[in-house]
Amino acid sequence: MRRRSSMDINRAIRVAVDTGNVVLGTKQAIKNIKHGEGQLVIIADNCAKDVREDIFYYTQLSETPVYTHQATSIELGAICGKPFPVSALLVLEPGNSAILNVNNEE
């Protein structure tokens, strides 16, 4: 089985942002996860430890999968087409993207 390259994952994230419904930012992601919304959380590699712990706590309660991207928050923001850092994003609807097929196995 072929592992997904970071370019495939980056493309899937961008397609999800462009065609689906995605929430950007840690505060909004956590808020939506608490309400049981979302299908996948993607966090940047350099996401703050306390925020990362909060995200993992609430995703365990809601059984929402988490993918830790190997990009920094600045790079993740650029992947999303935004001029600001993005430490976390929550995929509510993937749109035309195959982002939900991503796994965290390295």
Swiss-Prot record:
| InterPro entries the record matches | Ribosomal_eL30, Ribosomal_eL30-like, Ribosomal_eL30-like_sf, Ribosomal_eL30_CS, Ribosomal_eL8/eL30/eS12/Gad45
Query: Origin, by domain of life?
Result: Archaea
Instruction: Name one matching Pfam family.
Output: Ribosomal_L7Ae
UniProt entry keywords in alphabetical sequence? Ribonucleoprotein, Ribosomal protein
GO cellular component terms given for this protein? cytosolic large ribosomal subunit
Q: Which GO terms describe its biological process?
A: translation
Output one GO MF annotation: structural constituent of ribosome
HAMAP family membership: Ribosomal_eL30
> Its family?
Belongs to the eukaryotic ribosomal protein eL30 family.
Official protein name in the record: Large ribosomal subunit protein eL30
